[in-house]
Amino acid sequence: MTPGLIVICGPTATGKSSLALALARRLGAPILSADSRQVYRGFDIGTAKPSVTDQEDVPHYLIDICDPTETLTVADYQEQAQALIAQFHTEGQTPILVGGTGLYIRAIVEGLKIPRVPPQLELRSQLQSQGQVQIYQWLQQVDPPAAQKIHAHDQVRTLRALEVFYTTGIPLSAQQGKNPPSYPILQIGLDISDLDQHTDIIQQRTAAMVEQGWLTEVQKLIDHYGVELPLLATLGYQEMKAYLHQQITLEEATAQTILHTRQFAKRQRTWFRANSGIHWFDATNSDLLSLVWKDIQGQPWL
């Protein structure tokens, strides 16, 4: 067997982590997370982070590697992921990269050449004080291609793109060349074609997160890091924070989270479907594991 990389990607709430665990057990493979929020300690329930039991059962990497006040750039993630993949290859292992952060996956699969601009804390503070609406408008002016790929409410990525532009004078979108890896890669995509069914799953998952103590998690993050923590403005956490501050009801917070998750899944679907190299599978197929396993066995390098 030639060491390579198995990628499991696709929209949120399609069972990517469960499939990765099942395959990792069969292959004796480590799992690398490709989730831009699971890298942060304390953001657990709302990011569907693998449980402690699952992490003890199968080695997971690139989870809980940063404090929420720290900045992990795509270049930082890429560097750490590439180092881990190289390490596993020397041990004869093929790791599994799983997640829904498209840029993280592209950084590895396509070998994106990403500008290594250190975080500019003073600049970030100045930009953040202007509010997300204003800074996103600035991004649309200075780097339209980057703005098209970044959601208008994604403050973390908006700040980073502006940071790169104001530090280097060159738009982030103009600095991303490619240097694809030489090892073989199998990309597996999971999706649910029945959007009503996918919505039901998102509703059930959101309700389960609340029952598991998501509100307590958000309150602890607010108490420890402050209400202005940028990560608390991300999907789900923003809505739960609004409820805790008595701005909306829990029913409204849950409904908004479900709606925004559906919208996020749509954007992920568009992103990943543009990649012709992905082998797609129906996440609701009862024979999913067998079908994916057959695909893996059909790869000459595995």
Swiss-Prot record:
It holds the Pfam family IPPT. Keywords: ATP-binding, Magnesium, Nucleotide-binding, Transferase, tRNA processing. Residues 35-38 are annotated as: Interaction with substrate tRNA. ATP binds at residues 10-17. The record marks 101 as: Interaction with substrate tRNA. SUPFAM superfamilies: P-loop containing nucleoside triphosphate hydrolases (SSF52540). Substrate binds at residues 12-17. Its cofactor is Mg(2+). GO terms for molecular function: ATP binding; tRNA dimethylallyltransferase activity. InterPro entries: Dimethylallyltransferase, IPT, P-loop_NTPase. It catalyses: adenosine(37) in tRNA + dimethylallyl diphosphate = N(6)-dimethylallyladenosine(37) in tRNA + diphosphate. Its EC number is 2.5.1.75. One of its GO terms (biological process) is tRNA modification. The keyword Transmembrane does not apply. HAMAP family: IPP_trans (MF_00185). Monomer. PANTHER family: TRNA DIMETHYLALLYLTRANSFERASE. Catalyzes the transfer of a dimethylallyl group onto the adenine at position 37 in tRNAs that read codons beginning with uridine, leading to the formation of N6-(dimethylallyl)adenosine (i(6)A). Belongs to the IPP transferase family. This is tRNA dimethylallyltransferase. It comes from Acaryochloris marina (strain MBIC 11017).
